[in-house]
Amino acid sequence: MYKNKFFQTIKNILIIMLFFWLREKGYVNNWGFVLGAIGTILIITIISQRLKIKNTMKNLDRLKSISKLIATDPDKYFLELDTLIDKSSGYEKDYMILHKANTLAKINRASEAIDILMHHHPRYLDTNNQGVYYNNLLGLLVQENRISDAKKVYDEFKDILESNLNNNFAYSIHTNIANLKYHLNQKADAIKHLDQAIESTDNQNIIKNIQALKNKMQK
């Protein structure tokens, strides 16, 4: 989302600079024309953004309406979801792909979720959702005992994961890293991350589960 806004702003600035360059070179000698053209561009940009927002809301409404299919006909649900993904772009597409992977993981289709997350590269997600994306991928890979792949993901996206350690899902990041470290025979680091996971949440049920995992690792 933020990248989209950044590139849109840069594009608008470049267009405005182009008009001033054309005027300086004598191609455009009418200030009224220049200002009118700039105004037209801004109006088109605003209309384009409004249409994009309207389309996004329409897709989200459709996504909500088909959610009941997850329990009754998951294959049909994912077929409908794929149609929405194909029609989307930018942040919206990245977010829907993340949603698809999360849903697959929740219904115990982890290998499919991993394939989606591994083969897609979310260029438009904000830092928070990128953290969710790669944390989920890391956790699923460790869960499926694909430790080599998990290590590659951790090494490549460590900065993104660490940039989210102040968020409300920091305990999950620490726990997934701890599980990876434990499988890599780095027990001390694993315990350290579990301690940090406990410190980063007030949820007693989560703390209880993390403590149980810590006790298991310490045996």
Name every feature range the model reports, one short phrase each.
Residues 57-91, 95-106:
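Alpha-helical segment of the N-proximal tetratricopeptide repeat
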Residues 155-159, 183, 187-204:
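TPR/TPR-like (Sel1-like) alpha-helical repeat modules
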Residues 48-53, 82-91, 119-127, 158-166, ...:
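Solenoid-like repeat scaffolds
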Residues 60, 64, 98-99, 135-139, ...:
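"A position-specific structural signal for the A-helix of alpha-solenoid helical repeats
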Residues 36, 66-79, 105-115, 145-155:
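Helix-turn-helix repeat elements of alpha-solenoid scaffolds
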Residues 92, 129, 149, 168-169, ...:
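Structural signature of alpha-solenoid helical repeat junctions
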Residues 43-65:
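Transmembrane-cytosolic junction motif
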